[in-house]
Amino acid sequence: MKPPQRRRRVPARYVGEATGPTAWSPREMRHLLRLLQARRGQPEPDAAELAQELRGRSEAEICRFIQQLKGRVVREAIQKMQPGGREGPRHQGTPLPAPVEVWMDLAEKLTGPMEEALTAAFSQVLTIAAAEPLSLLHSRPGKPTKARGKALVFLSNQDGQKDPASEGSGPVPMTAADPTREASVSDPKASGANPETSGLASEVTVPDPDAPTKSLAGSSTERDLAVDFEKIYKYLSFSSRGGHGPELSAAESAVVLNLLMALPEELSHLPCTALLEHMTKTYAQLMAPQTALPGEKRPRPGTEDGGTGSTGPEEPDQASPQASEPIEPRLAWKAVGICPLNPFLVPLGLVSQAPSPSR
């Protein structure tokens, strides 16, 4: 006997109704209004006190609703103070919003009900990257791993001779390859005394020809020079969720700062023309008015206010297996509305470095 049909459900972390706040009923709003009127003399209402008398609502929900009320009061006051709205005389000289502000507003509309899922997924990507073998190889000191990388070519010393550590045969694990390493000149005597530590001595010696070369000693100094990329990834993962990550050393903080400072330079290496065409096309599609398909019984959420058509999942009857259209891979995300980590559906080839003409 054929079993009954089982309707597939979207995970709760991707459903807008599950992650978003529930709507306030008129009874709850009237009750909250009476509570606020009774506390009219207070400068700021206490959310914890209101939550005790308003059953079924948490402190965060009450604070969020009060902020919405404040925003509505501000908008009404602005409309009274500035007659004519945006067409009035005071708005004629108002500058247009910057492009980044337009994209940020559109991204908030797309990922509003899924912000928690997006943040968790982005944090998981950084957590997985912390366990990559290359992260362990590039750390200083290196961590034990079965992966092997290419041998690093160290800088030559004053005599023009290569470092003995780079002349070894066979692949060796990379010890340190981070942006914080600076070129420093080592003493020939110190570099020839111990071939195994000459590569490290060339990095930590003082570039003063008059003073004798000495290796940095002390646990505090070694801790400042240590670079653990696993800790850096964990720090970025905690920061993306608004938490407090592990404390970074001086060298690790320099790596994070160098990554942030290198972002403007990396933008010039992207295929800007193709990326511009894709973003322009995507913006036009998202802002275009959505028309209901013949098989749909009701429009998708979000088509009334912003025209994005991607602010929430579809109704369950639209995702039923009785649909006549052929099942395509992209329909898996259609039930969700958007891809959490890629709301603008940018191809991965457009976020990699474009080949230069010299290559």
From Swiss-Prot:
Write out the GO cellular component annotations: cytosol; nuclear body
Stretch list, region Disordered = 1-22, 157-221, 291-327
Q: Which InterPro entries match?
A: SNAPC2
Subcellular location, record wording: Nucleus
Q: What are the Basic residues biased-composition ranges?
A: 1-11
- Supply one GO BP term: snRNA transcription
A Pfam family matched in the record = SNAPC2
Which UniProt keywords are listed? Answer: Nucleus, Transcription, Transcription regulation
Record function comment:
Part of the SNAPc complex required for the transcription of both RNA polymerase II and III small-nuclear RNA genes. Binds to the proximal sequence element (PSE), a non-TATA-box basal promoter element common to these 2 types of genes. Recruits TBP and BRF2 to the U6 snRNA TATA box.
Q: Tell me the protein's name.
A: snRNA-activating protein complex subunit 2
Where does this protein come from, organism-wise?
Mus musculus
